[in-house]
Amino acid sequence: MFNWVKTAMLMAAITALFIVIGGMIGGSRGMTIALLFALGMNFFSYWFSDKMVLRMYNAQEVDENTAPQFYRMVRELATRANLPMPRVYLINEDAPNAFATGRNPEHAAVAATTGILRVLSEREMRGVMAHELAHVKHRDILISTITATMAGAISAIANFAMFFGGRDENGRPVNPIAGIAVALLAPIAGALIQMAISRAREFEADRGGAQISGDPQALASALDKIHRYAAGIPFQAAEAHPATAQMMIMNPLHGGGLQNLFSTHPATEERIARLMEMARTGRFD
């Protein structure tokens, strides 16, 4: 129930951002158009954003015949987590990473890059996929997918405001400085929403994944290895669609400054430390 409340609050917050930007571009008429657009985006995000994200990454669905070891691993972990079997996808990318998407556990999908399958041991890979299934079990996947879709739309509209300006309800041009301010601040506001939701969610998925696999040390080892390998291997699809970065088990974006400040993932060192403490104590609370 709490996740539904969070989802509703997220949609309301992003809708408010759309309305503010619409007001800057076109006054009261722009606000009305932005509201209608936001409602349409909310509907689209709920029903279709998972398909759109998988298409962005050119993810290919696999089964027991095309990727038998990986598919059986996901099925075994889903059974341990008491979850329906999700659809399973592979992404032809060297960068090691993985994510889950979908609107609920009955319509979930998990995806991993070919790079992560090469880099990690089977034990470490179990830890990663258990983490992704924890997102499914906690019903995080709808929130993360909606956030990714809406944040991308906010950035696009904000750029439109900066380059094309806007007019008030009387047709007069708005202050160009205000338009630039909206273009700069709206994506930051969207990033803050993503960050606030995503960081706590990653810790919970680490904990939940450790419970599902029964092996927190394996996930800790996987995170360390992904962190080291990913630093030197660009993830082209993620760089092209940065709003989806918060869906990944590890931040796939390269860069510093504001990008690090607004990172949607907690520090890898802290995640590893928490997992190692779970391994030491045998407690997952």
From Swiss-Prot:
InterPro entries: HtpX_protease, Pept_M48_protease_HtpX, Peptidase_M48. It is found in: Cell inner membrane. Zn(2+) binds at H131, H135, E202. Disulfide bonds: none annotated. Its main location: membrane. It comes from the Bacteria. Keywords: Cell inner membrane, Cell membrane, Hydrolase, Membrane, Metal-binding, Metalloprotease, Protease, Transmembrane, Transmembrane helix, Zinc. It is an enzyme of class 3 (hydrolase). One of its GO terms (cellular component) is plasma membrane. GO terms for molecular function: metalloendopeptidase activity; zinc ion binding. HAMAP family: Pept_M48_protease_HtpX (MF_00188). This is Protease HtpX homolog. It comes from Burkholderia multivorans (strain ATCC 17616 / 249). The lineage of its organism: Bacteria, Pseudomonadati, Pseudomonadota, Betaproteobacteria, Burkholderiales.
